[in-house]
């Protein structure tokens, strides 16, 4: 679900078994709450996503793109194939390892410059590879320093302006 939240179309991506149900409401309350949080984060980011989608339309450069599109001269941009840019200012380093003791390990390459780790709010110096640990309800995404991300707040329930809870 985390990958789906940071891609052009939100959908769950969780298994190679086609018949396995992946809807948020089929999981335990704890996991369902985490999935709702991921979906809310996606809704909060809709202004940014729309802005970057419009730019993709105008430039032909994909909303989701491999790191080497933005950093073609840097070897790590080719080595860290799971990482990608989500628009111009958000870098996603998906958690793909199994969890141990409630956390998953993610090796992250940060390009030159400063980056903000969304989950912790920490400022991290780029130009290095870091090993980070994330709980199930944390997202391994990084924001370029100086970026302005247009976002909704948590009170937005849907994009039609009605006050109906959707998640």
Where are these predicted regions, by residue range?
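Catalytic-domain carbohydrate-binding cleft regions of carbohydrate-active enzymes
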Residues: 1-147, 152, 160
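Short, intrinsically disordered, charge-balanced linker/junction segments flanking boundaries
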Residues: 160-167
